[in-house]
């Protein structure tokens, strides 16, 4: 499971011109689910994102988490994060989870964040979405869940 997380002062996702999710201060998460990902991956990622200290304290140091600031989270599924661009000029999505599995884990991830007390807004799975944001900083991180040891 891969996530691009961005600290935002606001973010919105639209489908067919209609706003389907919007947050103020918080984190925008672009989430990609890969073959072999399980609920344990979503658990790890949710815990990491909610507690990652990427917000500034009064001294200007990144010392506060999403939980600390009582921020919001906008979750957008993005299967292209599972794309492999190492060969040729067209990305391969062979490592992307099948849609049914990906949607299940995407919804599970959103539920875990909600259970932790963070307000969650989301896009629509498999929809063509338009995402707008004000990246605060800018602060952007790429997270990848640990792979299972063979």
UniProtKB/Swiss-Prot annotation:
Chief location: cytoplasm
One GO biological process term: D-amino acid catabolic process
Short motif (Gly-cisPro motif, important for rejection of L-amino acids): ranges: 137-138
Gene Ontology molecular function terms on file: D-tyrosyl-tRNA(Tyr) deacylase activity; Gly-tRNA(Ala) deacylase activity; Ser(Gly)-tRNA(Ala) hydrolase activity; tRNA binding
Enzyme Commission (EC) number: 3.1.1.96
Enzyme class: hydrolase
Top-level taxon of origin: Bacteria
HAMAP family assigned: Deacylase_Dtd
Family statement: Belongs to the DTD family.
Assembly mode: Homodimer.
Protein name: D-aminoacyl-tRNA deacylase
Organism name: Geotalea daltonii (strain DSM 22248 / JCM 15807 / FRC-32) (Geobacter daltonii)
